[in-house]
Structures are given as structure tokens and as C-alpha cells.
Amino acid sequence: MMPLGLFPLPRAAVVLLISLLTLPAQAAERVISLSPSTTELAYAAGLGDKLVAVSAYSDYPESAKKLEHVASWQGINVERILALKPDLILAWRGGNPQRPLDQLAALGIPIFYSDPTHIDQIASDLDKLAQYSPHPEQAHQAAEQFRQHVNTLRDRYARSQPKRTFLQFGTQPLFTSSGHTLQSEVVSLCGGENIFADSRVPWPQVSREQVMTRKPQVIVVSGTQSQVDNVSAFWLPQLVVPVIALNEDWFNRASPRILLAAQQLCQQMASIPTPVAESH
């Protein structure tokens, strides 16, 4: 007979149990988000109704557009934040200036930092946000759905023939991604091999010659079809390979919607034939 403690629980029961264990004495009532990605995380975790202000470019979901802006690329409006009396601030460690955040923390305002460098950390952030959410079960369910979607993509494309992939950001100067970014993980998820995965810095500046030397089979950019045309023209005549453009917000924000970019990339990359043999 199986011991009671080892009896397998249905998935729904597990999610409910986790929700009860992480339910705080009092959920956050006045939340401020300082980046578009943390704004999306807040809504996914059931905190959308508690947001009182957000950062510039927080445009998803639609209701986020109606909220006051207290942060932008120019900085954080500490005075206005204090006037709004938040009991929780969601910050982007890699993008928000640290000094004003330290000032706010010194005044006793809880700050939740989000800066995932791995896809699985987005789900972890959702689970962690459950403790502040009036709907913790929503946060845990969003995290579980995210993990399931990631696993589905991994299973579907794990056996794909690897394609050497150049992640391109800009042209003059020309930047790319190392293997230690979310964007590179999305490429790997779809069977791509980031040709600059070995870079020691997350976002290295590279030369045209360095890219050519590594012989990419596909180029990935964020943008629209016009971006595809511009990038293709930029590499002519030396390099003629498929260029895939991904929705900029989906691809560049550390939120659940990054899996929409992953699905977009996986489908397009799978349709690109792999050369039978190449000369080296």
C-alpha cells in the first residue's frame, strides 16, 4: 500500500496547494511596474487590477495603456512614485537605474526584481509573484502553462537539424547576442545554434567579417518585413541566407509572450531546408 504522503495528487490539486502555501497575509494593493516586461508579468500573475502606474511603452494588455507613466529611458520619477504610495514595485534589474531603486527600498517599499536570462526563469518569476497577488492560483497556473508550452516546443523541435544562426541587432554598429540571453535560448529551443554563443559579454559588437567567418545559415532579427528586406540588402552580395523577422515586443520582452516569438521562429526555421553538405 502506498504511504499517504506519497499518494500522487492531480495537477489541479497541486497548483491549489502551492497557492495556499504561498498566499500572503495581505496581497499587494498598490503596485508600480518599471518596465514593459514586468507590466506583462503583473497582468499574467493576477496583479493587473492593482497596478497604479507603469513605465513608458507598457502597452500590453490594452488596459496598461491607460496607466500613468513614472519611468522611461530617462530615469525613474521617485517623487511621483512616493506620492502614489505603492506597497510593491516591480523592477527590471538589467534596465532600471539602481540608485533610485535603492532610495525607494530604503524607505521600506518592497521591490521585486525580474531579469530572466533563461526561459524557465520567467515561469519562476510568475510563481514568486503569487505571494503578492490577490489571485495566487492565477500566477501559478500561468507559470505551469508557460512550462508546458516550453516543453512542447522542446519536444517538437529537439530533433531538428541544427542551423547556424546569427542574431542581428542593428547594422551600424552591428550587435549580436551571446549564449547567455533569453533571445539565444529561444534560438536554441527552435533548433538553432547561435554562432556567437561563446562570447564573454552578453551583447557583443561584431564586425561584418566576423559574421562571415562563422558562416551563418539563417539570420534572425526583430521587426517587420521591411526589416527583412533591409537586412538582406545589407549582407549582399557576400551573404545570401534566409532572414527571419520576429515580433519585436514578443522577442525582446522577458514575459510569457516570448513564447509567441519562439513559436513564430520555430515554425519558420523548420521550413528552411538544411544544405546536404557544405565545404569548410
From Swiss-Prot:
GO terms for cellular component: periplasmic space. Residues 1-27 form the signal peptide. One of its GO terms (molecular function) is cobalamin binding. Disulfide bonds join 190-266. Cyanocob(III)alamin binds at residue 57. PROSITE patterns: FE_B12_PBP. GO terms for biological process: cobalamin transport. InterPro entries: ABC_transptr_periplasmic_BD, ABC_transptr_vit_B12-bd, Vit_B12_bind_prot, Vitamin_B12-ABC_binding. It is found in: Periplasm. Keywords: Disulfide bond, Periplasm, Signal, Transport. Residues 30-277 form the Fe/B12 periplasmic-binding domain. It comes from the Bacteria. The record marks 79, 209 as: Important for BtuC binding. The complex is composed of two ATP-binding proteins (BtuD), two transmembrane proteins (BtuC) and a solute-binding protein (BtuF). Belongs to the BtuF family. Part of the ABC transporter complex BtuCDF involved in vitamin B12 import. Binds vitamin B12 and delivers it to the periplasmic surface of BtuC. This is Vitamin B12-binding protein. The gene is btuF.
